[in-house]
Every structure is written in C-alpha cells, then in structure tokens.
Amino acid sequence: MIEALIFDLDSCLAPAMEIGTEPYGPALEAIEEANLGTLSSNALEEAINDIWSHPFDMVANKHGFSTAMIEAGIREFGKIETPGPLHGYGDLSFLDSFDIPLFLVTSGFRRLQESKVRALGIVDHFLEVVVDAIDEPEARIRKKGIIKGILDIHGFSRDRIIVVGDSQHSEIKVAEELGIRSVQTLRPGVSPAPKATYHIQDLGELPDLLESLDLE
C-alpha cells in the first residue's frame, strides 16, 4: 500500500510562469547589469530564456554566470512575491482524492515559492510544505536531503512512497537515486523522462494508478 505522496510544485501543480514575466524584470535587469562582458549578448539572451523554465542555480551553472551575476540574481529574485491569486492546473481538485499524507517539496526562492503556495490556496492539502531555498545556501540540503528527511522522520518505506513531479533533472532524478518510484506529470512542454516509473497527463489519473499498485 502506498503510504504517502511527495509532490513538486512548478509544472506539476501550477505553471511555473503563471505569475507572468513582469515580476522578474528587476532581477533580469540586475543580472544583465552585472554581466560586464562575462557572456555575449546571444549567450545572455539564451540564459535568460532558460530562467523561465529552470531553477536559477541550474541556469547560472549551465551558462557560466559570474559571482556578481549570481549575487545580483539571488538578491533580486529573493524579493519577488506572487502579485495575486493563482489558479494552477485545472485538476488540483484531485488533491482531495487521497486519504494518505501529502507532502509538497519545491525548489526556488523562499518568498516566491511560499507566496505561490498561498496564492494557490493549497496549503491545507499537505502535511508539510518544504522549500528547497536557493537563497539560503548555508542551510540548503536540496530536494534529495529533504525527501530523505521525510522518509526518515515519518518512517516511510521507500517502496511505499511515490514522488510526483515533472523534472527529470530534479525530483525524478532524486527519486531514482533514493530508490523511490516516481510519477512524471506530462504538462504542456514537459518531455517524458525515461527514468520516471510512471507517466500521467493529469492528476485525475493518480487515484486509479494508486489503486492498481495497492492490488499488486
């Protein structure tokens, strides 16, 4: 029997850019000002485009941001909050379908991620909401450490937990490394991850999947 589900947030429960691009303006300007020739204009444009769909730290590492660019980005991104209510994907009502503990583990800037969860109105669905905060590097244990901590604290067996998310480079990878099954949500623009245990188009498929696993 599956004992708990661990969900991702962005591109799993809500589009990462549902808040729009405007709140990101000051952070992107700060990164551009701190560039000072580190990246060519084309390379910088490519990096900025990646920011819309990937975690900032991953983008900074991939594109070779300078220390000044990283510091500018962290400083300004850390100030962003969701400007208003969010709706998420149209299947969030299925979060009511589960009678097992649900956990939410999301990577990003703490203020922004916590404001997204509040704006979606989904806090009460989860036993715990944990932010893998990019802007708190000294305390950061990343998603792998957070998920392992959930298993250890609650005494869950690894074969009775499922991680639900979209990113093959983040939660899907972590699940594989920890020996946990994963369900990849194939939201618009998400490519199937070969290493995900299962794939679904929307959360409405999860209850039947869990029922089939309980019958095994």
Predicted regions and their residues:
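Active-site neighborhood of HAD-like aspartate-dependent phosphohydrolases
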Residues: 1-41
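An amphipathic alpha-helix signature
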Residues: 21-29, 52-57, 110, 114
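A metal-dependent, Asp-based hydrolase signature
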Residues: 30-33, 44-80
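Short, acidic loop-to-helix structural element flanking the phosphoryl-transfer center
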Residues: 78-104, 144
